[in-house]
């Protein structure tokens, strides 16, 4: 929440053209507490040792696991991107399961190098489905998570690999390359379900 006299009254809606979506956002994103107007940013922050507020995540990207721990999906994704095999990643978790999983768009050059070192041939899709490749990349991703200081429940336990890049054209990301989680989950539903089997 941020509040004070500089917080606006809400999103502008013209009286002659009411917008129900904006009206709903004005109700859900703005509130008055003890006479002070607040805006619900949706950000999750933490104070640093020197008292500065640091934005660390978005509330909508926090997921509660079965045991009650919260996983910050974008934090996990940022750590996974440090793995040389990972081009893009989407972490997934829900309250029905005790661990997170991830869908990874592989980097082609490191993938081919890994395949050659293991004497595995095939096109990119075949490599992404190869059990040895999946295990090697999963292990590398888990090592990146340890190096990124993720705790055990934050580290995805299983991984689904894809060679197809996520672009605005295939509607997996926005024009600003932010993940469209619902679209990715829908496209990889069978792989995510298999990861929880």
Which residue ranges define each predicted feature?
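Short Gly/Ser/Thr- and Asp/Glu-enriched loop/turn motifs at secondary-structure junctions
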Residues: 58, 94-99, 154-156
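Conserved ATP-binding/catalytic segment of the ANL
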Residues: 1-65
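Generic, well-ordered alpha-helical scaffold segments in large soluble proteins
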Residues: 10, 29, 44, 79, ...
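Generic structural signal for hydrophobic residues
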Residues: 76, 133, 137-141
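C-terminal boundary motif of the adenylate-forming
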Residues: 40-44, 83-110, 145-148
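Adenylate-forming
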Residues: 7-12, 29-30, 52-81, 111-131, ...
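Conserved C-terminal "lid"/linker of ANL adenylate-forming enzymes
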Residues: 63, 88-90, 138, 143-197
């Amino acid at each position: 929440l941020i509040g004070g006299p500089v917080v606006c009254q809400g999103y502008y809606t013209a009286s002659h053209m009411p917008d129900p979506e904006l009206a709903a956002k004005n109700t859900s994103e703005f509130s008055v507490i003890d006479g002070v107007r607040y805006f619900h940013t949706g950000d999750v922050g933490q104070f640093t040792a020197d008292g500065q507020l640091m934005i660390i995540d978005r509330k909508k990207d926090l997921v509660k696991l079965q045991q009650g721990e919260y996983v910050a999906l974008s934090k996990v994704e940022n750590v996974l991107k440090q793995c040389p095999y990972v081009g893009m990643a989407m972490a997934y978790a829900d309250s029905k399961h005790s661990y997170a999983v991830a869908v990874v768009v592989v980097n082609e050059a490191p993938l081919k190098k890994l395949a050659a070192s293991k004497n595995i041939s095939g096109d990119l899709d075949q490599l992404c489905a190869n059990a040895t490749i999946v295990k090697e990349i999963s292990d590398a991703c888990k090592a990146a998570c340890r190096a990124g200081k993720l705790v055990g429940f934050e580290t995805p336990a299983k991984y689904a690999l894809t060679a197809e890049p996520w672009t605005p054209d295939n509607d997996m990301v926005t024009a600003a390359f932010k993940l469209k989680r619902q679209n990715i989950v829908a496209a990889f539903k069978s792989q995510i379900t298999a990861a929880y089997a």
